[in-house]
Amino acid sequence: MARLSQVSPDELILDLENPRIPDARFANEIEAIAYLYSQADLGELIQSIGNSGWLDFEPLIVEESTRTVIEGNRRLAALRIIANHQLQQRFKVTLPKPLHLNAKPDEIQVNYVGSRNEARDFIGFKHVNGAFKWDSYAKAKFAHS
């Protein structure tokens, strides 16, 4: 059964076998972050968190025994870059100035699960049948209002 908790992002591990990236496996977190940065609009997410702060409204789903993030790898990768100057240099990321006070949270909300199978229903709904993706105009209009 899932269990809600607060945890330091530093204690979590990116999923090196992320099913959303079926054609790639990573040797380490740096490779996973590089892929997410180049292929999954991580730059936009970093800027959003940098400007508005971490919004803890949707818990990451984490396999408790391994601390592996099953759902929320983009968000964790963004936090990793925001918190690490060497990663910022590697990916040529310029953070907003001033950086929002809550852009580097000490703790984030996670939903611990016992296994990947326990998380499948939620992840399947979100990513297979999930919310309709907004186009650029809709995003801009919402941000402006």
Roles of regions detected by a PLM:
Residues 1-98, 107-109:
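Short, charged/polar connector segments at secondary-structure boundaries
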